[in-house]
């Protein structure tokens, strides 16, 4: 974290000297990325965006986008995103947010599910979800999305901890809600079309029309 602060301050310092600076952030810089730190530092420096240095944030692809593309359509209705990292946010606050997501029946995307120093967080999170969701609720674990080392498992909330070897800082976990189902290894979160429309045409009707 201190390196991130140093990088941000250095980028701002170069920009204030008239340099064109690119600060690279993984995923989307506006989702758990570097742009928040840049703006916090600038706010502390009383930066004026009208006559101060020019800042442009170029959007990227966050883990919630890349991982959902690999496992079906898990984010078709309302969803929540929670990071398990307690380096900057107290664990007690993270627990409150997890519980709120579980109670609200949100599909939940979990960033930073574990590290070498953090081994209990995901177990505690799973226990919270099991209070409000069925054990067979679909869960996806995606490690290293779109990298050569990519690994994907679609399992259940009950069996989530059976895959501890996949958990780490480049892993994203997606917990389905009460409507999510597993179809041939894909997580599908229905948008609600089926309650309003007939989704697939009847075979006999199609043949007659032809």
Regions found by a protein language model. Name each.
Residues 20, 103-210:
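A contiguous loop/helix-start segment that scaffolds small-molecule binding in enzyme catalytic cores
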Residues 31-104:
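Class I SAM-dependent methyltransferase SAM-binding "motif I" and its flanking Rossmann-like core
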Residues 2, 27-29, 87, 144-145, ...:
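Short, ordered loop/turn segments at secondary-structure junctions
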Residues 2-6, 29, 33, 62, ...:
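Conserved active-site and cofactor/substrate-binding residues in soluble primary-metabolism enzymes
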Residues 10-13, 37, 66, 70, ...:
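Alpha-helical scaffold segments in soluble metabolic enzymes
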Residues 1-55, 163, 202-207:
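Class I S-adenosyl-L-methionine
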Residues 1-7, 81-88, 193:
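Short, acidic/turn-prone active-site loops that include or flank metal/cofactor-
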Residues 12, 55, 69-71, 95-99, ...:
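A generic local secondary-structure boundary/capping motif
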């Amino acid at each position: 974290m201190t390196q991130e602060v140093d990088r941000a301050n250095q980028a701002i310092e170069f920009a204030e000297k008239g340099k064109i600076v690119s600060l690279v952030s993984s995923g989307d810089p506006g989702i758990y990325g570097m742009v928040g730190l840049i703006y916090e530092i600038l706010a502390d420096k009383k930066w004026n965006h009208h006559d101060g240095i020019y800042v442009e944030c170029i959007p990227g692809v966050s883990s919630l986008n890349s991982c959902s593309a690999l496992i079906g359509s898990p984010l078709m209705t309302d969803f929540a995103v929670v990071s398990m990292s307690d380096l900057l946010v107290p664990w007690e606050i993270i627990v409150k947010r997890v519980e709120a997501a579980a109670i609200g029946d949100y599909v939940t995307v979990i960033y930073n599910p574990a590290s070498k120093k953090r081994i209990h967080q995901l177990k505690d999170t799973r226990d919270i979800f099991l209070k409000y969701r069925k054990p067979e609720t679909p869960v996806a674990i995606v490690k290293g999305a779109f990298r050569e080392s990519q690994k994907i498992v679609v399992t259940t909330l009950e069996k989530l901890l059976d895959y501890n070897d996949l958990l780490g800082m480049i892993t994203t976990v997606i917990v389905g809600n009460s409507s999510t189902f597993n179809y041939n290894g894909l997580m599908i979160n229905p948008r609600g079309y089926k309650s309003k429309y007939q989704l697939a045409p009847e075979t006999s009707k199609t043949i007659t029309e032809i």
